[in-house]
Amino acid sequence: MNLNPILHLKGRFEQRANPNKPGKPELPKKSVICVEHIHNLKKQLQEILKYWSKNTEINGALVSVHYKRIVAKSNRLGILLSYPSHLATDSIRGAKFVWEPDQDGKTIQKHVFTHYVPLSAITKAIKLLEVVEGIVEKHYGGKITEEEANKINTQSFAHRNLITANNFIKVLRDCWYVERFDIDHVSEEVQDDRIITIYQTDIDTKQLLSKFGIHIVDDRILDGTTIRLYPDEVNQLIQKAGYLISMNVTDLSQLSRDHILKDEPVEDDLCNILESPANEPIVGVIDTQFDEKVYFHEWVEYHKLVDENIPLTPEDFHHGTAVSSIIVDGPRGNPGLEDGCGHFRVRHFGVATHTAFSSFTILRQIRSIVSSNRDIKVWNLSLGSQLEIKENSISPEGAELDRIQNEYDVIFVVAGTNKASSEKDKMKIGAPADSLNSLVVNSVDFNGKPASYTRVGP
């Protein structure tokens, strides 16, 4: 079967500058900002400034901005925490969701963005809040409505000697959307190895960790801010600098076993039923080992990437071989899955055995494999964690897959992970199935109903 090569569109895309200047900022409909809320935000920033003035290890400040709800990009901080040549949004180092009560007591999902800023940015924000607090207290009776704010004339604003009209309204907008400022800390005791992502600061990761008595080598650093730590190191970091931790997950994964395969070895007595491959597209597979004795072995280019000193058992070949068999000749084993796409060649990288393994080590291998095989655009990954993903943030594994896909223009087909038969309730997917850019798949029957072992997410 002869196929045309993949076409790549190349060119330069240009966008004409918008000749229209942005208009005067406005408050949302029916919004009311009370002086008490402005005062509380100011006091919170004052406490944060005091904390970071004493704790100088990160050469700046981490400030978590808790919003009242999920906010659009245009409704994030507009002026507070900005500083010369930097918009407020430029300093965002992390984002997460929390479930908390709203003003009516109903539990809703809210945004939290963590900023890394110089202390001068906090000082500036405090001064702006102080000015706006005074104006609202003295000239608007302690609260200002959307109608009053939007009637302000930028030319005749009476307080231009203190603050411009536009900046006055920008501060009010920030106050309307922001619930509070805080310094968020991770506080838990761990007993296993962890993959930790810390917030990016202006200090090299190894140098920063050494300030807290943690010394690591380069092979425990994934992308500059994602690191592998042992239990005592994790607990030490939590105790001394819990504010640094953006994401963390147990560094232990295992196969996301496809129940349809039942871990049976692929039959090898079907010789000569497949033509030799020609120029069919290649799919990359990152899994356990591949059995080169199977009938479709001509279609698979196998690379064994586990250490030669690790003994392999027959079980170490079952899952990986079965996955590649589906890609090469899937409908032969299950005619109901015939999609008319024909056969695909596979470049198979055996990175694991059937037992549990280090996610961190596999992630390092995945980046190396993808970067060295740029001709492959579609990758299959059936390795995942048996533990559920965090409710409020993406996993370090999922984030790394997203980075790899963005950097190398590839897509991963990732197993949604399966729950054990002993699990009766619904169970969320496991990392890295929370990757945003990946195509995550799970099992359904021919009526479209989820299988008993299917997990849910995110």
Specify the residue positions occupied by each region the protein language model found:
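A generic structural motif
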Residues: 103-124, 196-199, 220-233
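Catalytic-core regions built around general acid/base machinery
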Residues: 396-409, 431
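Loop/turn-to-beta-strand initiation segments
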Residues: 343-345, 409-413
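Extracellular S/T/G-rich loop segment that most often corresponds to the catalytic His/Ser-adjacent loop
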Residues: 281, 289, 295, 430-458
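Protease zymogen maturation seam
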Residues: 163-194, 206-282
